[in-house]
């Protein structure tokens, strides 16, 4: 589910970025909740992934997401799975409320280095991403501890948190990407890092040409390497190094 696709921050690589002349769509919390329930009752879906561009401000956007989930959980008794994407810059109390209503949360890093963030997403900073990620990690730990003491304590994102990295939009190597993933798993105890092959949709000298094929094989190899990190305890340095920075 997407509350709004009108990007409130500037991402050079996004088809929905502020400067792109594309049609914007916005759902009210009630509309999105009703649409979700209609699909759920027909067994078309088993859950909801809720995301939004920033509308007005991070706090206002997060409040609209919370209201959507409140309607689903409290009024419609929606029993499906909910994955909510946290809004960087939103107040901690709002992110906490969102996490209580959702089964899993995510804060998407998108780009694997400070340089690429500054170049392609200048409105996004490392701190704006890692602050809510750290908050979610701490809230999950607090919730787990509370549930040991009180059976009916509210659950916070019981399915954990995840993030996403775009592959191929920048020159970042697989070694850099896997090193970042390993650090995120260790420090923030993420359940998953998802890798998404960059699909060129805009013309910009800072990006691969629109005729460039999406690096789907590279995406596949990163998922294979990620499996070794998560399930077999490998370190990124055991798979790659600066002399051999790519998996393929």
Pin down the residues of each PLM region.
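Extended low-complexity acidic/polar segments
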Residues: 96, 107-110, 175-206
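Flexible, glycine/charged-enriched surface loops at secondary-structure junctions
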Residues: 145-151, 195, 234-241
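Catalytic cores of enzyme domains
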Residues: 160-166, 170, 191-192, 198-200, ...
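Long, highly charged, low-complexity intrinsically disordered interaction regions
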Residues: 203-248
């Amino acid at each position: 589910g997407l509350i709004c696709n009108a990007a409130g921050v500037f991402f050079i690589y996004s088809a929905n970025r502020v400067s792109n002349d594309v049609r914007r769509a916005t759902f009210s919390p009630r509309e999105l909740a009703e649409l979700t329930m209609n699909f759920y009752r027909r067994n078309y879906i088993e859950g909801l992934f809720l995301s939004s561009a920033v509308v007005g401000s991070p706090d206002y956007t997060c409040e609209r997401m919370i209201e959507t989930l409140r309607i689903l959980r409290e009024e419609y008794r929606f029993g499906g799975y909910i994955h909510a994407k946290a809004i960087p810059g939103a107040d901690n109390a709002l992110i906490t409320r969102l996490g209580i209503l959702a089964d899993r949360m995510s804060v998407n890093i998108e780009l694997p280095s400070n340089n690429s963030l500054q170049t392609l997403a200048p409105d996004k900073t490392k701190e704006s991403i890692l602050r809510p990620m750290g908050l979610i990690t701490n809230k999950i730990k607090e919730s787990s501890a509370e549930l040991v003491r009180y059976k009916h304590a509210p659950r916070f994102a019981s399915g954990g948190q995840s993030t996403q990295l775009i592959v191929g939009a920048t020159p970042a190597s697989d070694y850099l990407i896997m090193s970042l993933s390993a650090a995120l798993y260790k420090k923030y105890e993420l359940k998953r890092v998802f890798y998404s092959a960059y699909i060129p949709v805009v013309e910009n000298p800072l990006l691969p040409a629109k005729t460039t094929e999406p690096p789907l094989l590279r995406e596949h190899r990163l998922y294979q390497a990620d499996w070794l990190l998560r399930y077999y305890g490998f370190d990124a340095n055991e798979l790659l190094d600066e002399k051999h920075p790519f998996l393929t």
